[in-house]
UniProtKB/Swiss-Prot annotation:
GO CC aspect terms: cytoplasm
Main localization category: cytoplasm
Entry EC number(s): 2.1.1.199
InterPro entries on file: RsmH, SAM-dep_MeTrfase_MraW_recog, SAM-dependent_MTases_sf
Naturally occurring in which organism (per UniProt): Prochlorococcus marinus (strain MIT 9312)
NCBIfam families noted in UniProt: 16S rRNA (cytosine(1402)-N(4))-methyltransferase RsmH
Protein name: Ribosomal RNA small subunit methyltransferase H
Localization terms from the record: Cytoplasm
Assigned keywords, A-Z: Cytoplasm, Methyltransferase, rRNA processing, S-adenosyl-L-methionine, Transferase
Amino acid sequence: MQTDLSDSSFFNHKSVMTDEILASLEHYPLIHNNQLKGIDATLGGGGHSYHLLRKYSDLHIIGLDQDPFARKSASKKLDEFKNRIDIRAANFADFEPKEKVSFVIADLGVNSNQIDDPKRGFSFQKDGPLDMRMNPFLEVDAEKLIETLQEKDLANLIYKYGDERLSRKIARKIKMDLKVNGKYSGTKELAYSIAGCFPPKQRYKKIHPATRTFQALRIAVNKEIEVLEKFLQIVPDWLLPGGIISIISFHSLEDRLVKSSFKNDQRLKNLTKKPITPSEQEVEINKRARSGKLRVAQLN
């Protein structure tokens, strides 16, 4: 079952590290000039773009998002800037701007509203279908993924993308459940089955034992690593000389890719040898910000 596109009221995502994103763009030498253009490669609910459009009165932004629910919500949030925001249905790895821009920002985190909406299937806090697609038109969802992968491949995926040491045991349990009982009823049943692979003392810790496996499945369903690798290769070509790339990541796989790209791409000057992290005040207000890491680079 899909969420009704007519109801975007649930999409109330709180953008992460907004002040730090704004500060990172001050490295661009012409940031205060007229006719400034930028790309928000992960528009989401429009939070980062909202603050940018408020700060820079002559700024025009192209906002990209593959999630139709996010685009509808962002359109409402940014209505007062409708003459300066161009919202596109696109995955950032497949986009090609017609002209170069002054900056590109990207927040690689899963939108909190995607997590909180049980119909999207990202979370086990509330039961929902095993979906996990950021773009609801993708062919393979989480249910189809676990059904079609061989046990060994599923274990490797859970280990690689979730850093889960019990990946083999979990994959074996998932494939056995599917063989004996058929499809899982939803996210909660899968999470319960995964938790059963852990010793009793580890089942009731602060972080749910299924968290890493769910992360791995989400990354695989949306091909997040492959998409990010492609994006990092093409994004310098989007920029004007001196242009800025600011990327927020939330797990080590993504951060390593961004760090390596900014360090080794000869087209770029790395402006953050160490990542910028959220302030204590922000983490206190928004717990989901705590693992955010911002890295910034400038086109030579």
